């Protein structure tokens, strides 16, 4: 159970949940930490066990039922007629929290050899929250939750290339309608779209190469106040993912694949603000607490499209910091006789951008009509701050995949 004092403005409440402060001062600059934060970060959580076991790798791996999150264009090359999967991710268990969970349901249907449609439902439960006032009196109790519902269409444009388009509705209710002083709160809502592409070709009789790109969550800013304020609203996690994967068939029974993903948020980087101190003749600090002159970087309060473009060149430390904003995933998958899989991977995020570093491993077993997958996350950040205190440490994912076409054919 968690307690939150509901006595400040909603912006502060938003920061309690997600750390969504978009300004830094000299103290932050000295520490070097300049993370990019957004609303509804649950959209960035890897929902399935296969990709979760490969270091969050997925934009160019072979198509599967969970391709929606990683690259909807891959559905055009999927072999089975129809499929569905359900995944469950217990979240932040390393913090001793037992009631935060992600549930994920996805499915697809091949209209013909060229076209495929797909859908997904993502539900994030943040557990029980008790709201208190300045006197610690309980003023309410609520279970914050978020969800996203999406549909996608994928089509082959050639024997080697496909594109995908997806639309998504996002709903985030963190406060249950509680008010912060005179500021009323509402559930945040947004509409977003994904645009993706996938290319695959044979390098030899036993080796293939695939390349993928996905720009996801292109949509309106999200606000939790009754009166929408463009400057006070938060970006949703508009994201660019690019990667490749090489598949090698060793013989009739053994197959391996290895790939790399690069990932970058397409939202503004927080600038550095001047922390100006003014002392009067009596030695009293009369500084203006609202002084917000930008001394490095760019104004993050811009429109969505401007923010996407600006995200490539707005970092306070220039190109060096822009490159630090790229996360890397690398993963390896081994299949034996298309029935048993072993997977491992590594994820890297620069320390100044969050410092997530972890190894992953997992396994999968496929039967005639269903497949069971599991993944496990191991903390790899051994810095003094992160070692032994990574909230993602020991995260497990569970996925159950159904080949509905085989079920119909076999009469199950």
Where are these regions (language model features)?
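Bacterial Sec-dependent N-terminal signal peptides
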Residues: 1-23
